[in-house]
């Protein structure tokens, strides 16, 4: 091997080592919050010609959040607290969530729950939640005003209607 080839090989190896060190350093300096996104931004990124979309909560919020709950208008503050959800970032009027407000709550076993306020003009989940709660009540079951939870591996179906993503399943 010529002297030029040896020097070129040494430079390439040195550059490779520096790149690997930078990658290692950047991965160790990452923020501890592994939250990958939120429901609103995930649905907003869907192509305009897509009218139906299925998402998995774990794909939206990350594997660390194995369940998602929805807080809808009329839900009582004491019932939300019973579900061990910090109500600091949730708006209540007269002890209940007011009309026009809804929230998605990503639940983690090891991290603080992530609360996302949903804009009902962009993402509507409460119509479906209300229908499911009424169906449960007709069968003699009750949430007793609590927060409905969905496992992170259970798909959530959404359909776009007039620019609003509505949960349909």
Give the location of each predicted region:
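Generic alpha-helical propensity signal that fires on short helical segments
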Residues: 19, 83-88, 130-131, 136
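Generic serine detector
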Residues: 26-27, 40-41, 102, 108-110, ...
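Mature extracytoplasmic domains of secretory-pathway proteins
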Residues: 57-126
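C-terminal partner/receptor-binding element of secreted or periplasmic proteins
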Residues: 125-169
């Amino acid at each position: 091997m010529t002297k030029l080839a040896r020097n070129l090989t040494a430079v390439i190896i040195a550059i490779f080592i520096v790149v690997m060190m930078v990658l290692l350093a950047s991965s160790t300096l990452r923020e501890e919050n592994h939250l990958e996104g939120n429901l609103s931004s995930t649905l907003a990124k869907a192509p305009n010609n897509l009218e139906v979309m299925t998402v998995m909560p774990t794909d939206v919020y990350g594997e660390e959040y194995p369940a998602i709950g929805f807080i809808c208008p009329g839900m009582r503050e004491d019932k939300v607290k019973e579900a061990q959800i910090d109500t600091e970032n949730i708006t209540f009027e007269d002890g209940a969530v007011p009309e026009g407000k809804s929230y998605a709550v990503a639940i983690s076993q090891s991290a603080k729950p992530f609360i996302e306020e949903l804009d009902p003009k962009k993402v509507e989940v409460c119509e479906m939640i209300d229908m499911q709660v009424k169906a449960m009540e007709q069968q003699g079951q009750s949430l007793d005003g609590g927060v409905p939870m969905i496992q992170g591996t259970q798909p959530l179906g959404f359909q776009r209607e007039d620019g609003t993503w509505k949960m349909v399943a």
